[in-house]
Amino acid sequence: MGDMGDPPKKKRLISLCVGCGNQIHDQYILRVSPDLEWHAACLKCAECNQYLDESCTCFVRDGKTYCKRDYIRLYGIKCAKCNIGFSKNDFVMRARSKVYHIECFRCVACSRQLIPGDEFALREDGLFCRADHDVVERATMGAGDPLSPLHPARPLQMAAEPISARQPALRPHVHKQPEKTTRVRTVLNEKQLHTLRTCYNANPRPDALMKEQLVEMTGLSPRVIRVWFQNKRCKDKKRSILMKQLQQQQPNDKTNIQGMTGTPMVATSPERHDGGLQANQVEVQSYQPPWKVLSDFALQSDIDQPAFQQLVNFSEGGPGSNSTGSEVASMSSQLPDTPNSMVASPIEA
């Protein structure tokens, strides 16, 4: 046995012609509802032998096929008086189960045409207006007391408005069913849905060859596949129309919360905030007096002390600078002779 999850493969049945009973090997097969198959040369009217194809209407009754003209002539509804059929543009009058032309809807006794609102009686021998119906009823009951109440054997009816002969109520019911059948809902599994959706994404309107391949792949009937694609296209169309309407309403959409009206906004990615201050960059430099620079240089270099002292005095010289030079001289006298005499001391934390 195969895998229970796989759909059963559809067996290709042999097509037999209903007309001649032989197998059909032709390229094209004529199918008549519900499941009758014919050769193109065997499907013809049983009365006039006219060939029937997809360009004309075919009727089946008691195993025989008829063209539209002969079927209406043989089995169509006819006027109860003139026994002539109705055209699609005719208006008719109804009396119980019988149908009449408007011109034929007359009293058989006085030939008066009955119009909507007139009372009439339908008897075995035809239509009677109320006056003639009373006369016939009295004559049938015999000569009795004229003051005795009249008990009509058949109740009177009132003529209604004429109706069109094209209404479905006047059409012959060939395949009449006593009760309305309930259509079984088809449930698709995940594999079938995946196959159908993949094909739909590639082509929402597959041709006949693609549909036949889907029938073989999914195990579904052609009708189920056709209806699924129709429903899918309808849903997508409704969804696209709804999205367009939402996009058109979005610019004019307003949000009102507790009396405050605002426009909806969409949050974007965060950006760096510069503060918005317009200022020029200022470069800060440290300043040291000249004697400080020279003192540091003397500590790190082995130079002649008198020449260095003269250089310090020269850099600090000038009018009003005697006090500064004496301070530098006294400070330099306290410095060690050479950098080699410096003793390293530990750095306190």
Swiss-Prot record:
GO terms for cellular component: nucleus. SUPFAM superfamilies: Glucocorticoid receptor-like (DNA-binding domain), Homeodomain-like. The keyword Transcription applies. It is found in: Nucleus. Residues 17-70, 79-133 form the LIM zinc-binding domain. Its main location: nucleus. One of its GO terms (biological process) is exocrine pancreas development. Keywords: Activator, Developmental protein, Differentiation, DNA-binding, Homeobox, LIM domain, Metal-binding, Nucleus, Repeat, Transcription, Transcription regulation, Zinc. PROSITE patterns: HOMEOBOX_1, HOMEOBOX_2, LIM_DOMAIN_1, LIM_DOMAIN_2. SMART domains: HOX, LIM. InterPro entries: HD (IPR001356), Homeobox_CS (IPR017970), Homeodomain-like_sf (IPR009057), ISL1/2-like (IPR047169), ISL1/2-like_LIM1 (IPR047244), Znf_LIM (IPR001781). The keyword Ribosomal protein does not apply. Residues 312-349 are annotated as: Disordered. Residues 181-240 bind DNA. Residues 321-343 have a biased composition (Polar residues). Gene3D superfamilies: Cysteine Rich Protein (2.10.110.10), Homeodomain-like (1.10.10.60). One of its GO terms (molecular function) is cis-regulatory region sequence-specific DNA binding. DNA-binding transcriptional activator. Recognizes and binds to the consensus octamer binding site 5'-ATAATTAA-3' in promoter of target genes. Plays a fundamental role in the gene regulatory network essential for retinal ganglion cell (RGC) differentiation. May be involved in subtype specialization of primary motoneurons. May bind to insulin gene enhancer sequences. Essential for heart development. This is Insulin gene enhancer protein isl-1. The lineage of its organism: Eukaryota, Metazoa, Chordata, Craniata, Vertebrata.
